[in-house]
Structure formats: structure tokens, C-alpha cells
Amino acid sequence: MVVAVYPGTFDPLTRGHEDLVRRASSIFDTLVVGVADSRNKKPFFTLEERLDIAHEVLGHYPNVQVMSFKGLLKDFVRTNNARVIVRGLRAVSDFEYEFQMAGMNRYLLPDVETMFMTPSDQYQFISGTIVREIAQLGGDVSKFVFPSVEKWLTEKVAAMDPASGASAGQP
């Protein structure tokens, strides 16, 4: 049984992420979607919200598990007995960083492979950062995220404090 881990911040989970999950889940016996805590990135959604979103969007895949992780990816990979790390590459600009990370992961986990997947054509330009920016500026993100994610974005943006730009209830 081959287990793969697809790690990410998923802030928010986009149609591009789901496309990769759909395709990777057809290759591996189990695909573990690891939602990274990523506090240093100051995510728009809390870890709990990102987990809820991922469960809503990906819950219908029978061989996909969604869980959070903190700390080093290598520890999460080992905990889940994974043999493969799945990463998405949208553009050449992604490759340099991902290539360095794959090299480090190979050093830390010599028996684990990194598999790069490119998105389907219609999702090559989608990123969580761009989706968040469009949503915060009142734009239509319905082509980039699932309806449930669009609802999460709309509610989160509405809860923003216009005076400070910070989310309500957060510093």
C-alpha cells in the first residue's frame, strides 16, 4: 500500500488544489492532505477553518484523509508512513523553491520520493494568494474555488475590521 502526503497551507483550498488531490488520489492507495499550521505565514484562515474547508471540499474522496500538522514535514511524513510527497508546480517560478525543498526532503528522508504534478490547464494561474486578494477587493472568485469556499471567503471578508485591516477577533 503506497501512502502519499500532499502538504500545504491551503489558504484557501482552491479548485487547483482539488484538481491535484483528485488526480493524485487515483495514483496512490491513500493520499493524506496535510494542512500546515504555517503561523509564520500569517494565514487568512485559522488552522481549524482551513481543516473544515478541506473536509468540506475533499470529504467525498474515499482514499483521502485530511489532517493538520505542525513542525517539520519529515515528521508528518514518517507519522503517516508515507513513501511519497506530492507537490504542485504551476510555473517555472514554483520550480526553484520546490526543487530545493525536494532536495532537502531527500536528505532528511532518503527513502521518500517527491512527485511533482502540474495543474490541469484551467488551473495553472490560480493561487490562494491571488484568490484571497480578489475576494478582499470584492471580486468574483467563483471560478477559482468551490461554492462552500466562496462562502467562507465572503464571511471572512465581511468580518474584517475596515479600520485596521485585521480579522475580527484577531490582532
Swiss-Prot record:
UniProt enzyme class: transferase
InterPro entries given in the database record: Cyt_trans-like, PPAT, Rossmann-like_a/b/a_fold
Matching entries from Pfam families are given as: CTP_transf_like (PF01467)
State which pathway it belongs to: Cofactor biosynthesis; coenzyme A biosynthesis; CoA from (R)-pantothenate: step 4/5
Q: What does this protein do?
A: Reversibly transfers an adenylyl group from ATP to 4'-phosphopantetheine, yielding dephospho-CoA (dPCoA) and pyrophosphate.
Q: Where along this sequence does the record place binding of substrate?
A: T9, K41, L73, R87
Gene Ontology process terms (BP): coenzyme A biosynthetic process
Give compartment(s): Cytoplasm
- What keywords were assigned to this record? ATP-binding, Coenzyme A biosynthesis, Cytoplasm, Magnesium, Nucleotide-binding, Nucleotidyltransferase, Transferase
Q: Which gene encodes it?
A: coaD
The cellular component terms of Gene Ontology attached to this UniProt record, alphabetical and capped at eight, are: cytoplasm
Its predominant location is cytoplasm
Q: Where is this site: Transition state stabilizer?
A: H17
Reported cofactor(s): Mg(2+)
* Keyword Manganese in record: no
Q: What is this protein called?
A: Phosphopantetheine adenylyltransferase
